[in-house]
Amino acid sequence: MTKLGTGTEKETVSQQIEPEVDITEEVLDDGYLDVMEDKTVVIFAVGGTIATKKDGEGYLVPAASGEELCKKVPGLDDLCNIEVVNFSCVQSTAVTPGMMLEISKQVQEILKRPDVSGVVITHGTDTLEETAYFLSISLSDEFQNEYFKPIVLTGSMRGADAVGADGPANLLASVKVACHDVKEDIPRVVVCMNNEIHAASRVQKVHSDNIAAFKSPSWGPVGYVDDDLVYFRAGALDLDMGFNFPTPEKLTAKVGIVKAVTGDKGELVDYFTSQKVDGLVIEGFGRGNLPPEMMPSVKKAIDSGIEVVITSRTPAGRILDSYGTPGSVKDSIQLGAVMGGESTSAKVRLLLLYILSQPKAQELRREDPELFRAYLQECLDPVLSERLFSIKA
């Protein structure tokens, strides 16, 4: 196996990429990745555009196995030992939360192997951010502390047989991240696309077809891959998720999403209340404010025992109680709603599905609803948690 670099001593290089932003980069003394001949990176293939080929009518369909993907990447075997697990070969629109739970369980078992350095999951880009987020919340703090290894999700915006296919480059960069030997400041779950590394908790797909489709609004990437160099921002680990509740056997909770619109009178909120869902995510305007005529329906939902979380329709920025007008975040807090911080509605839905499917969480919810909501608020926005609940009190 050929080494990419011969250095063995690590040094820390600090530089300013932009004013008042401190970036710490971990590199070897010759600036190259340390090749780990005795370590293995597992390619966990789920499907997606990265695995698609054109059918007889010219439409893209999932067709390539994980082994086929690896064969198209020159130099991949030179980085480390590669193993492949073919979990599925589907478009990511067909990936369900139940599949995400199974992926999480299998990946955690793989990471327990002492010879495994990390896992790279090849996945469709449409729901890649959701699977990444689910993995980040399903890794307990205890597991992350014991098995300090990265999970890297990647995909492509172009089919496997397209001119200029980006899949091979994304896969190569992701394996470099997974076998990078300096992991103290690396979030356990990241997305690596177009040589940028994003935290699962912040990343979003922001373009339907551009190869630079993934961004982290308000935050930016936590690192990047440059040839054989892998850089990480100082403090990137702070964007990790992880909870103390055990992983549920099944996702039994029912959670809905409602997007607030002008003139909304809460009809969809009333519908979900009638369906006795366990949780409801409401996308508000801007800071999270809702139409005043929607508030009676929100109150009814909360009074019926539904956990309501308010998010924003905007792609960047956080929920904040800046206004005192009817339908404001202040009103929602007083009713008992939880604020979603900077998380998207799709990610908050997965968080509620995960937490509300756990027997211990349901027990806490029954015994002390206020404490449970405080815990939920802490998960979603620890910075605002104490202040938001003091307002309600």
What kind of feature is each model-predicted range?
Residues 2-110, 316, 361:
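ATP/NTP phosphate-donor binding region
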Residues 52-53, 127-132, 164-171, 289-291:
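Short glycine/serine/threonine-rich phosphate/pyrophosphate-binding segments
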Residues 153-227:
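Internal gly/pro-rich beta-alpha loop/helix module
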Residues 3-35, 284-393:
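C-terminal non-catalytic interaction/assembly regions of soluble proteins
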Residues 113-128, 275-287:
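Short acidic, glycine-rich surface-loop motifs adjacent to enzyme active sites
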Residues 17, 21-31, 35-48, 54, ...:
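Accessory alpha-helical/coil subdomains and C-terminal extensions
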Residues 121-148, 290-299:
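Short Gly/Thr/Asp-enriched flexible loops that form oxyanion-binding sites at enzyme active sites
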Residues 53-57, 132-133, 163-166, 198-205, ...:
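Short acidic, glycine/serine/threonine-rich loops at helix termini
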